[in-house]
Amino acid sequence: MPPRPRFDRRAPVRELPNINDRIKYPQLRVVDADGTQLGVINREAALEVAQERELDLVLVSEKANPPVCRIMNYGKFKFEQEKKAKEAKKKSHQTEVKEVKMRYKIDQHDYEVRINQATRFLKAGDKVKCTVIFRGREIQHTNLAESLLARMAKDLEEQAEVQQTPKREGRNMIMFLTPRKTPLIKNEKEVTTSAKAERTIS
């Protein structure tokens, strides 16, 4: 019986960035930190310039002839690239409409579960459709459903704004919430405290 193939469980080798001594090309086209073209110089001279400026020599275009390097603060450059990637990912998030369903006769525990669900959706950047479902003659109590949705909007006001106030939709009562873009100042006391703090700082 042939031996069973072995699976390599080792973690994949992490590719290291081409900077400083890892750059092996003898001739390089070098761009200074301020964008000035230093022209084509040998590797040793390029490294010496980077060291004099207490910066890094970073390979930015390996396919060019000769390869192009830039003198920069690599740590800062990497941080900015990661920051831009995170922002791009955040902007690419497709807003969805998540639904939270309940009956107008809801106990406190179940209500808190719905509040937690809505909070999670809002923090993820999604809109929330709050739906109160009526059964049979319960449709006569739309006022209670409106009160429940108003209570929900109040409890979520720090995370959400009401995009659409409660209204009938078939045999349901619905309300739409959207993530709050600006922080909520609850009352005059907070406004006064905030103003005093600003005057103290200035």
From Swiss-Prot:
Domain of life assignment: Bacteria
Keyword Protein biosynthesis: yes
Keywords for the protein's UniProt record, in alphabetical order: Cytoplasm, Initiation factor, Protein biosynthesis
Ranges in coiled-coil conformation: none
InterPro entries: T_IF-3_C_sf, T_IF-3_N_sf, Translation_initiation_fac3_CS, Translation_initiation_fac_3, Translation_initiation_fac_3_C, Translation_initiation_fac_3_N
Compartments where found: Cytoplasm
GO biological process, alphabetically ordered: ribosome disassembly
One annotated Gene Ontology cellular component of this protein: cytosol
Gene Ontology molecular function, alphabetical: ribosome binding; translation initiation factor activity
Role, per record: IF-3 binds to the 30S ribosomal subunit and shifts the equilibrium between 70S ribosomes and their 50S and 30S subunits in favor of the free subunits, thus enhancing the availability of 30S subunits on which protein synthesis initiation begins.
Family listed: Belongs to the IF-3 family.
Subunit structure: Monomer.
Name the record gives this protein: Translation initiation factor IF-3
Origin species: Prochlorococcus marinus (strain MIT 9211)
Gene this protein is translated from: infC
